[in-house]
Amino acid sequence: MSNALVVAGDSLVPSNRVSQMHPVFKAFVCGSLSGTCSTLLFQPLDLVKTRIQAHQLSASAAGSRPRMLNLLIKVVRNENILGLWKGVSPSFLRCIPGVGLYFSTLYTLKHHFFSERDPKPLESVMLGAGSRTVAAVCMLPFTVVKTRYESGKYGYNSVYGALKAIYKTEGPRGLFSGLTATLMRDAPFSGIYLMFYTRAKKLAPHDQIDPLFSPVLNFSCGIVAGILASVATQPADVIKTHMQLANEKYHWTGKVALNIYRTQGLTGFFQGGVPRALRRTLMAAMAWTVYEQMMEKMGLKS
């Protein structure tokens, strides 16, 4: 039907308008909508991860390590159930356009350089890392605000107020604090994830299962890829969080890493690893599954 809507099987966008969209814009829309779903569902895990890592910055926290379940209970008790979604506004402002920008950049690069063949493993790493770098740099100010919102240490009243306060007190540098650590975390994660995800999908027996269960199989491939990528990039995530919570205390990534090692040892680089691995793995797996289903509905190869 000419006015039917084609997004993940539901009626959201008129099909005649969809067909007129540029493929890159279609990839952006699909990515943004998949990012919306995954961000809303898994925001509580990101909040818990940030609280665990913020706990490291407290002098009184020496020798004590909060458990994920205890933190969840504490947040619900002190801030009610909606407290688990604290920071969801900057998360949306970061993830919705950020995920869309990532997928549209990835689509552009992939179809420009690899239109006639699939990328090799190392090429997949470079594709994922390059696309994520573009998105991460553009969205970093919102990442800083999100991290501070979730930490519970800052009394910002709005995202705009937070951006204004950071710029006023710390300058442009404050809005891009943790840039190096963010790229060290996000670019490798996306590159490693894309490599393992595409390899896992090739090994998966797609021809032996009902097409109806294809999204489940893709989601399972995403889980495996996400776990491997999360473990590899966890230290960079801890460093990034420390830099974004410490105002002007740290300006050099190496200094932060050295301080974590001196005060926490090697285990300090893996604080918040479980909730982060859960969130990043589930978010990436869901985002890719939804994105690929939506792109298929639009008649495009992801």
From Swiss-Prot:
How does this chain sit within the bilayer?
Multi-pass membrane protein
Q: Which residue spans traverse the membrane?
A: 28-53, 87-113, 125-150, 178-201, 217-243, 272-290
Tell me which InterPro entries the record gives: Hem25/SLC25A38 (IPR030847), Mitochondrial_sb/sol_carrier (IPR018108), Mt_carrier_dom_sf (IPR023395)
Record key words, sorted: Membrane, Mitochondrion, Mitochondrion inner membrane, Repeat, Transmembrane, Transmembrane helix, Transport
- Name one cellular component (GO) term: mitochondrion
Annotated Solcar repeats reside at: 22-112, 119-203, 213-297
**Gene Ontology molecular function terms on file:** glycine transmembrane transporter activity
Instruction: Please give the chief subcellular localization of this protein.
Output: mitochondrion
Substrates-to-products reaction catalysed? glycine(in) = glycine(out)
Which BP terms from GO are recorded?
Answer: erythrocyte differentiation; glycine import into mitochondrion
Q: Where in the cell is it found?
A: Mitochondrion inner membrane
Q: Does the keyword Membrane apply?
A: yes
UniProt cross-references to PANTHER family, sorted A to Z: MITOCHONDRIAL GLYCINE TRANSPORTER
Q: What does this protein do?
A: Mitochondrial glycine transporter that imports glycine into the mitochondrial matrix. Plays an important role in providing glycine for the first enzymatic step in heme biosynthesis, the condensation of glycine with succinyl-CoA to produce 5-aminolevulinate (ALA) in the mitochondrial matrix. Required during erythropoiesis. May play a role as pro-apoptotic protein that induces caspase-dependent apoptosis.
UniProt record similarity statement: Belongs to the mitochondrial carrier (TC 2.A.29) family. SLC25A38 subfamily.
The record's listing under HAMAP family reads: SLC25A38 (MF_03064)
- Name under which the protein is recorded: Mitochondrial glycine transporter
Organism whose genome encodes this protein: Xenopus laevis (African clawed frog)
- What lineage does UniProt assign to this protein's organism? Eukaryota, Metazoa, Chordata, Craniata, Vertebrata
